[in-house]
Curated annotation (Swiss-Prot):
Provenance organism: Photorhabdus laumondii subsp. laumondii (strain DSM 15139 / CIP 105565 / TT01) (Photorhabdus luminescens subsp. laumondii)
Positions contributing to D-ribose 5-phosphate binding: R196, D220, D224, T225, G226, G227, T228
Primary location: cytoplasm
Pathway in which the depicted protein is active: Metabolic intermediate biosynthesis; 5-phospho-alpha-D-ribose 1-diphosphate biosynthesis; 5-phospho-alpha-D-ribose 1-diphosphate from D-ribose 5-phosphate (route I): step 1/1
Protein's recorded name: Ribose-phosphate pyrophosphokinase
Pfam families hit by this protein: Pribosyl_synth, Pribosyltran_N
GO BP term, pick one: 5-phosphoribose 1-diphosphate biosynthetic process
Family: Belongs to the ribose-phosphate pyrophosphokinase family. Class I subfamily.
MF terms in GO: ATP binding; kinase activity; magnesium ion binding; ribose phosphate diphosphokinase activity
Cofactor(s) needed for function: Mg(2+)
Length: 315
């Protein structure tokens, strides 16, 4: 069996190190930096010939820089005769444009990035909670999309929730919320129906379900500016919710996210470590982080050993 080696770019060094620790190994020796004009510079400083290589790199902000680091690392390792290269992308950026809406003159950037990664020599992709699961079909290589929900659910079960109800922040998240509700002792579910007049601006319209006097658990795949989340929490409190907890896998926290969350009625925001948090976000008492390192390490081990990934999520 080829030697398994882990490498990492500069996007999520802490998570990459945690994964390496879980696998009782060290991160590979590669210098990932910049030339004087800002271009990405990569040099692999150890033998990888025939190796089973995993590159851990989220394509979060700065998105273009982190994406280029990933593809240049892939090319460097491919030219160094790596046996198999798996791109471990905990947060897959450029995933929001996955279709053309009403024949608008817009790109399908998720497909562009998928083609880009395939063309430079990625043999397989491991990612977490893709914004749209159909993105897996954009790749010409195998994609394993694992879920952060078991980690989030474990935390929910440890909380002393009083008469909980799981809330989907929009219609698109109903499947996710229903799955969480079933595993959270088969609790009830509510849905927030909202309209989005323009990008990153949402308006809460209607709550489907009775939340009065209950602990509400909002679940989503990502938190961007936090505008949707905060308005949802406000609407839930207005309808009599006792406490509001928000759970999401990907903590993007862009724009006015810090102020939005700081001034919101949300009791706690729980996220995973797929994206590094800014110092301002870390300073918020409302925000708490869970690590996906154990789950990612197990997925990497299974891929390397040609074992089932889906078996990780069978209940």
């Amino acid at each position: 069996m080829p030697d398994m080696k882990l490498f990492a770019g500069n996007a999520i060094p802490e998570l990459a190190q945690r994964v390496a620790n879980r696998l009782y190994t060290n991160l590979g020796d590669a210098a990932v930096g910049r030339f004087s004009d800002g271009e990405v510079s990569v040099q692999v400083n150890e033998n990888v010939r025939g190796g089973d290589i995993f590159i851990i790199q989220s394509t979060c902000a700065p998105t273009n820089d982190n994406l280029m680091e990933l593809v240049v690392m892939v090319d460097a390792l491919r030219r160094a005769s790596a046996g198999r290269i798996t791109a471990v992308i905990p947060y897959f950026g450029y995933a929001r444009q996955d279709r053309r809406v009403r024949s608008a003159r817009v790109p399908i950037t998720a497909k562009v990035v998928a083609d880009f990664l395939s063309s430079v020599g990625v043999d397989r992709v491991l990612t977490v909670d893709l914004h749209a699961e159909q993105i897996q079909g954009f790749f010409d290589v195998p994609v394993d999309n694992v879920f952060g929900s078991p980690i989030l659910l474990e935390d929910m079960l440890q909380k002393e929730l009083e008469n909980p109800i799981v809330v989907s922040p929009d219609i698109g998240g109903v499947v996710r919320a229903r799955a969480i509700a079933k595993l959270l002792n088969d609790t009830d579910m509510a849905i927030i129906d909202k309209r989005r007049p323009r990008a990153n601006v949402s308006q809460v319209m209607h709550i489907i379900g009775d939340v009065a006097g209950r602990d509400c658990v909002l679940v989503d795949d990502m938190i961007d500016t936090g505008g949707t989340l905060c308005k949802a929490a406000e609407a839930l409190k207005e309808r009599g919710a006792k406490r509001v907890f928000a759970y999401a896998t990907h903590p993007i926290f862009s724009g006015n996210a810090v102020d939005n969350i700081k001034n919101s009625v949300i009791d706690e925001v729980v996220v995973c470590d797929t994206i590094p948090l800014s110092a301002e976000i870390k300073a918020l008492n409302k925000v708490r982080t869970l690590t996906l390192s154990g789950m990612l390490a197990e997925a990497i081990r299974r891929i390397s050993n040609e074992e089932s990934i889906s078996a990780m999520f069978e209940h």
